């Protein structure tokens, strides 16, 4: 799998991966332009890391709130105003009746709560090793602590089983097992004021914390697809290695566009080798700062 291979390559190059940890504070030293990152491991132990750069895919709201020295009150209010939509998936293992081969299908039936159904075997047969079974992921869009989110796993599995039969993708007795995965802050909310809030946050972070780099959907509060979210991290690494802003990460969007800063030179000369996904475009207008 891709992420297992990524982890092995990281460790082979001397990197260390800490799982199940919670960052509690990011402290910036303006004199040395360096960071001290404090985190808690899964056993509750406290640790500290010194860093020249911090790359964050954590939700922008929480990242801004954990910075030391603290941001201005204006930026703090902007961060606290950002909203998120949460998400849960009910995975059902059932008899394979070859109902559909797509990776996913959207459900528009108002009589059910499910919004999308994933077919995990269509992503990779290795995800469903039993050839006689299929695993469907029924996706529900919700808010943390609402009725759906707060339902226990057994109730959610029963709801998903019943709705899968109702929409014609299963029959009684097909489902043999199920589990639930909840994902907080899966979607950044684009309300009337989010762009202003993000622009306000970006402006102060760029001015006061130049070696803090925001990437990914939550980190940038930007509704990127997974491949575009990963591209922001890849281009961010190029910026860090070059010690300059070669790429404007905020131009990576749903059309796989980005803007390379500076002279127009070939990828062969730069050696970046990232041309298969994004294409070069003119810089988009900056978001207006909060007035």
Label the model's feature ranges:
Residues 1-53, 57:
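Helical element adjacent to the flavin cofactor pocket in flavoenzyme catalytic cores
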Residues 28, 174-185, 240-291:
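Active-site-proximal substrate-binding core of FAD-dependent oxidoreductases
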Residues 35-37, 47, 57, 62-64, ...:
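Acidic/histidine-rich catalytic neighborhood
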Residues 12, 199-203, 288-289:
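Proteins with a high burden of low-complexity, intrinsically disordered sequence enriched in S/T/G/P/A and R
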Residues 4, 234-237:
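Predominant activation on well-ordered alpha-helical scaffold segments within soluble catalytic domains
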Residues 18, 90, 166, 233, ...:
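Generic detector of low-complexity/intrinsically disordered segments
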């Amino acid at each position: 799998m891709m992420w297992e291979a990524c982890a092995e390559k990281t460790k082979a190059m001397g990197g260390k991966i800490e799982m199940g940890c919670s960052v509690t504070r990011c402290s910036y030293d303006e004199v040395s332009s360096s960071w001290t990152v404090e985190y808690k491991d899964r056993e509750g132990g406290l640790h500290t890391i010194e860093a020249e750069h911090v790359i964050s895919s954590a939700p922008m709201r929480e990242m801004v709130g954990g910075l030391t020295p603290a941001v201005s009150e204006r930026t703090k209010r902007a961060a606290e105003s950002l909203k998120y939509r949460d998400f849960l998936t009910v995975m059902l293992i059932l008899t394979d009746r070859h109902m559909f081969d797509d990776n996913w299908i959207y459900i528009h039936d108002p009589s059910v709560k499910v919004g999308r159904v994933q077919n995990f075997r269509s992503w990779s047969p290795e995800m469903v090793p039993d050839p006689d079974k299929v695993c469907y992921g029924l996706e529900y869009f919700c808010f943390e602590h609402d009725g759906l989110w707060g339902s226990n796993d057994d109730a959610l599995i029963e709801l998903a089983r019943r709705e899968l039969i109702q929409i014609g993708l299963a029959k009684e007795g097909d489902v043999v097992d199920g589990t639930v995965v909840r994902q907080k802050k899966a979607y950044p909310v684009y309300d009337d004021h989010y762009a202003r809030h993000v622009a306000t946050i970006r402006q102060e972070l760029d001015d006061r914390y130049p070696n803090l780099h925001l990437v990914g959907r939550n980190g940038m509060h930007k509704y990127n697809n997974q491949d575009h979210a990963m591209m922001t991290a890849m281009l961010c690494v190029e910026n860090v290695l070059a010690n300059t802003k070669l790429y404007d990460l905020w131009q990576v969007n749903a059309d796989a566009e980005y803007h390379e800063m500076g002279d127009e030179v070939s990828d062969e000369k730069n050696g970046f080798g990232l041309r298969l996904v994004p294409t070069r475009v003119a810089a988009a207008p900056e978001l207006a700062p909060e007035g």
